[in-house]
């Protein structure tokens, strides 16, 4: 395991050893409110009844679902309508550059060296474009499947387990594209630019 993954695994093992809850699924964390001892505590203190706790959990699951839905829709839109078109445009510029290098230096031995980096970039960009497009499609299908579920808890768990993981995976490919695509063409503020906004 690498760095943070090892740290997370160690923390989970330590929490389990101490008898602490180490659940990291948000929808499942809300189940703690419906444990018998928690219900009893809320009843005895007169704060909330069991029905009120159940209602609050339903609201929390619904809020979680809505947040992941919105984030998935926005990321899908940004990916397909803003990031991919810019990456394709930049890739086309690189391909034009490769064609002009071949036209000018095609018969000379230095052509391979001169065109190696643009060709490598074109391949990498193409890989990221394909991955983002495929993952956005898969994420949309996972959302459609989760939306057919009527029970809010089960639906929230489905969103956590099948939709939310795509957010990080897609973002990782977009982060890589951000480092490759020409700064002038990139449609969104880059991380380094956000650091210096006043």
Model regions and ranges:
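Short, small-residue-biased leader/transition segments that mark boundaries at the very start
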Residues: 1-7
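Mature extracytoplasmic or organellar-lumen-exposed domains after removal of signal/transit peptides
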Residues: 11-198
């Amino acid at each position: 395991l690498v760095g943070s993954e090892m740290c997370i695994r160690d923390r989970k093992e330590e929490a389990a050893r101490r008898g602490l809850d180490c659940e990291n699924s948000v929808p499942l964390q809300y189940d703690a409110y419906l444990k018998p001892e928690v219900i009893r505590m809320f009843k005895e203190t007169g704060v909330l009844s069991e029905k009120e706790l159940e209602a609050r959990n339903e609201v929390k699951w619904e809020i979680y679902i809505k947040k992941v839905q919105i984030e998935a829709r926005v990321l899908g839109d940004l990916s397909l309508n803003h990031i991919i078109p810019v990456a394709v445009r930049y890739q086309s510029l690189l391909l034009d550059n490769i064609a002009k290098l071949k036209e000018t230096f095609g018969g000379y031995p230095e052509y391979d060296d001169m065109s190696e980096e643009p060709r490598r970039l074109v391949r990498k960009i193409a890989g990221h474009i394909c991955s983002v497009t495929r993952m956005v499609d898969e994420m949309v299908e996972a959302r459609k499947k989760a939306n057919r579920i009527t029970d809010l808890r089960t639906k929230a768990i489905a969103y956590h387990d099948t939709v939310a993981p795509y957010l990080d995976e897609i973002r990782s490919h977009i982060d890589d594209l951000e480092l490759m695509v020409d700064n002038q063409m990139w449609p969104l503020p880059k991380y380094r630019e956000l650091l210096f906004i006043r």
